[in-house]
Amino acid sequence: MMMARKQDVRVPTYSISVVGLSGTEKEKGQCGVGKSCLCNRFVRPSADDFHLDHTSVLSTSDFGGRVVNNDHFLYWGESGQMPEDCVDFKVHVVEQTEFIDDQTFQPHRSTALQPYIKRAASCKLASAEKLMYFCTDQLGLEQDFEQKQMPEGKLLIDGFLLCIDVSRGMNRNFDDQLKFVSNLYTQMAKTKKPMVMVLTKCDEGVERYIRDAHSFALNKKNLQVVETSARSNVNVDLAFTTLVQLIDKSRGKSKIIPYFEALKQQSQLIAAAKDKYEWLVSRVVKSHNETWINVNRRMQSSIEYQDYVHLEGTDKAKKLFHQHVQRLKQEHIERRRKNYLSALPRALESLVPELDEIDRLSWVKVSNLLESKAEFLKVFIVLEETPWEFTNHIDSIDERIPYDLLETVSAAEVYASYLEKLRNARKKEEMKRSFKDNLITSPFITPGKPWEEARSFIMSEEFYQWLEEPVYMEIYSRHQKEIIDKAKEEFQELLLEYSELFYELELDAKPSKEKMGVIQDVLGEEQRFKALQKLQAERDALILKHIHFVYHPTKDTCPSNPSCVDTKIEHILCSRCTYPYDRLQKDPNVDRINLVILGRDGLARELANEIRALCTNDDKYVIDGKMYELSLRPIEGNVRLPVNSFQTSTFQPHGCLCLYNSKESLSYVVESIEKSRESSLGRKENHLINLPLTLILVNRRGDTSSETAHSLIQHGQQVASKLQCVFLDAASTGLGYGRNINEKQISLILRGLLESKRNLNLVGSTPSIKDLTDCELRIVMCLMCADLFNIEDVLNALKPHTYRPSQCGLGGSVLLDLPIGSQKRRLELMMLSYHSSFNVRKTRLVHGYMIFYAAKRRASLAMLRAFLCEVQDIVPVQIVALTEGPLTFLENVAREQLQEGEEIAQDIEGKFLILPQGQTQPKFDVFYPFFKDVLEKKVIIEASHMYDNTAEACSTTEEVFSSPRAGSPLCNSHLPDSEEDPEPSPQHLLFREEPNISVPTKFTRELEETENLHFIPMINPLESKFNNKVPPPLKPKPPIPYEISKPELSYLDTGSRDGHRKSLTSINWPPLEAFDPSDYAEPMDSVVKPRNQEENIYSVPHDSTQGKIITIRNTNKPQSNGSGNGSDSDMDTNSLERARKASIVTKPVLYRTKCAKLGKFSSYRSSLSVGSDDELGPIQRKEVETGTQGTKGDNTTNSYEADVEDPRKRNILRSLRRTTKKVKPKPRPSLTKATWESNYFGYPLSSVVTSERPIPVFIEKCVEYIEATGMTTEGIYRVSGNKSEMDSLQRQFDQDHNLDLVEKDFTVNTVAGALKSFFSELPDPLVPYNMQTELVEAYKINDLEQKLQAMKELLKKFPKENHEIFKYVISHLNRVSQHHHVNLMTSENLSICFWPTLMRPDFTTMDALTATRTYQTIIELFIHQCPFFFYQRLPVDLPTPSSPSTPPLTQPSPPQSPPLTPVSPSLSLLPAEHNIL
């Protein structure tokens, strides 16, 4: 409706006349009442179009111009409005005024000569071509403004705005103005036109004037008053709109808003517009270098800009822009200033870093000092104009600091802070040094003492003032590391000083509790032992590590590694000797790989042909860019036959590929491996025990999806797991038809064999007397690792110009041509460390020893004593004491050790020499007496060595089951890491076909009868000991029964054993003249003949101290020859006695028997047997019966005497004959122990659990039964149950998973043992191997809270099945430990019983041996803190020392008794009642 009216009806137009006080200055004062400003603001409201100055004093020309047009009124134009009633209208505005002549200051004469009051009330205005008025500047320049004429030159006035100025006008009286307005109102009232009174200049209004104006309006009828301010644009439109509404009665009336309320609304509108404009400016203007012209052009189209300019004008908008730019500039300057000030400390640090240089200087002097520094211009810049913030430098990319900045207060404050920092740093360093000194001097700070215990002894208020707690802890941690490392070094030195004790105890890889207790007792009073009392685990680890070094001495296990003497000597000799690497190049074993291929039905030959096809023409194979000679030995028949033997005199295997394509061929592989390993037990070199195996499934068709193939794969994996070998499914790799294996797999296998070959040191053989063809004498020079002497000085005395590398010796061997006696002789000098010399002492022929020791080091002399204890007195010894200077300057310790060394030399009738270091070296002639003595005893030494080797080679080799360290714990070490015993003679490679062996084994029968294969580990002593499953012994030949327990096989697990060393002290030497070949009985299996033809002749030593031998003959068989050798008459005791009395050559003894200073710990050798209860299994602890020993015929006697051509040497050899005690052959356990096949036990966890039932049924039943009936059983899990009952329980459960344990009436210990057996038989331990290392690292964290949290996080990484079962078992053990007052099973005791079962570490590595203590404490921690780890509870409070519960977590299980923590997991589980699981 409204829109239609807008379209149909013309917009109404009204003419309004604005009137008010006008006239000369006398009448109106110096300024008008604001009529022009009111009209200007209404017609042109924009701030830029509003002008405050509108003069009424005009020149005649201006008055006559077209704008004024000789009239006393101005036409302001028209303005369109949209009032509240939404009806548009137009208003023509006319201002009635009175122009004054600028010459006469009188009103201009116009066409209307009426006075202003009459003229202003006129309703008809006419002025032809009169132009619209803008401002005063328009007059005379009309062409520069818009020219718009008054419509039709005439207007009819519709209403009047009566203006009253309520400001304090100059030279104007308000009352006079009010009288004038009153008259004017009276005149206008006559016109009957609407009228509104407008109060102008209210922004400067006077309250009285406003009040009077309102009073005036009240006296008039219907005279409305509007308060306005044209300058502030307040109520201007309201005044005109109100008048229009009076003119047009149809329009609604607007509310008259008081001035101050309207001003508030206008101010809010302006403020909002200003905020928006400022936001626009901040968004557009980002740089202080912006100009208004550019910015104004970019903002023209923005509504925010337009609104603000309309309200406030461009000038104010520009002003705000400049304010913003100035603010940006200041911010930029402040940023630069801040950067300069932040860089100033660094500048000071680079130019004046020392406090002493500036400590007492003022800032001004320091500023001058900086200018004199050479690096000044790199940091500062001197500007030509200052200050820098008013120069262009503020926009420069130069980062240097303006030099005039240093004159500011801020720079002085920075300097003061820098100076204070230096002073504080100096003070903190002083406090740190003081704190460190306090730690060093404090007697309360011992290795391993926690910070919480130490702080009360060392802290003071001054320390707390200057240093923070983390700083103390860091210093304390570093100090602890230093003193711990020092204590460990000193403790290691202590262990070396007690070398005699370790060698006398004959320790092996798993020492007994008894022997460990001896070590504790002997070392317990030493201060260096007590220093590690808070680090018992580390101390135990050091002892175990040292035992490992004694048991397996190499360069890697040497405590001085990498500064081992062997390494140093090799480097020195390589640089001195000519062609040092030639002999390595000539060694045929260095680049040779011997590979056995085992497989029946042609599999071995086919694979050998395939591999040869991949080789070059000369059987060379390239691996990683290096050429290797590949020697293949395919075997398809009975491995007991010599033709199918794994090892021959010329072929020593480095690995074996086992091929199968059926159950029968797999059975053949297993049976062959078993036979080979059994036969190797009797060999001095039992490398076949640890021969690397690879089991390969051959399937030419590549079919792996069939049921048969899947079954073969599963069986192969089980066999590989039990044999601890690699399983390779060659068919699954996508081979082509007709091929068994690809080149990539061959390379992978050969790389593994090379690594095993290096680790097992299977290259090189022990030289015998025949190795001495290029030299006449072999001398061993023994040097102590870590002795403070220069090896170069020692070697300088050996005529280095004569060095030549030995062709058959070791890395430290050289040849010397020396004049000894009447001619020049060739001598091989082996320069070795003591630990390498121990092996040489037994395994190689040595004519003499040159033993060096440092006079000031006790450990050096102790090692010398330990070494000499086992040397025969027929071997000459040269003792050389190394000193650091003249004797007069030596310390007391060095003097004492020099004296002791000289006394030892006198007692053993050896040579003694003092060799000062760093001085002129003595000539080689000083060793001439020693070499002469060696030459004189050469014959007797070689004869003795020949007899030792022959006797050992002919003895029953099953002695391997006794302690491998009978004579010396170093006999099985590798020297240096590469030496082995000689290749066995051909007679060792002959096997006899026994009826009981040729018959298929039980395992073979089971393999043929069933599809499922289940094997027990063959050489895993740890697992077998935990399960306590000892197989029934096989009956060997001869018929005297012997048994061997599975734990004894641990001696065969390590690859470091090269044979059993016999103690020289246990050998009885018969007199020379009483010698008869028949007096010596040796096994007939050492003779080269088939075993099925040998005689069952054995001899048993009887009263060996008297040299008597009783011969036992086999009466069922005739002698192999017709001689009378070996008859009873030949063994007449009286003849032996007479022969002893007539003896010329006495038997050799050990030096320990000739010198009281040697063997001071020998009492432990007799009091502690090697096969003590802790070291042997329960079966071997039985009394070992003496085996029989048969005599040999003349043919056997001559077999080893015929090689000795020298009659003199032969006679001496006869004189050195001695009885050899034979240990009875012991059967090796069969691979097939199990008598029943389980479909539950021994399977992976994933196959016995489900998502609905994550705990195996068997575990649930056992735990429920134990918790219901056995929580108070004393020693539960420690006391083992009956083995047969445990097997019965497992067998019955296999048949019925719903077995009721209560109904069957099993004992608690039986159920507990079966529970542990379940975990022991798992293919992988419950705690995965890959998590065990991470758990050990987490346990090493010192902070308890962090340790627990780290271990808790690691639990989340467990496989789901393992985690759930581990949680279940640990929770059960935690509940068991809560009854420890009754069952005596604390969390510590439970952890000792369970950690080997749950973790099953590999005890063939030193890391596992030394980590056993940590493993146990980890399981103990899990049990003790079970609520925290699994049930989101807080950690359990640490128990007090007196509490019977678990010990503190920081050291969960410190030993409470003198013996150290045992290493072997099986030993740690031995109960008090009996030593079985």
Curated annotation (Swiss-Prot):
GO biological process: regulation of axonogenesis; regulation of cell size; Rho protein signal transduction
Residues at which GTP binds: 28, 33-37, 52, 56, 95-97, 201-203, 229-231
Pfam families: FF_RHG35_4th (PF23083), Ras (PF00071), RhoGAP (PF00620), RhoGAP-FF1 (PF16512), RhoGAP_pG1_pG2 (PF19518)
Region (Disordered): 965-988, 1114-1133, 1166-1203, 1441-1467
GO molecular function: GTP binding; GTPase activator activity; GTPase activity; lipid binding
Gene3D superfamilies to which the protein is assigned, alphabetical: FF domain, P-loop containing nucleotide triphosphate hydrolases, Rho GTPase activation protein
Annotated protein name in UniProt: Rho GTPase-activating protein 35
Protein source organism: Xenopus laevis
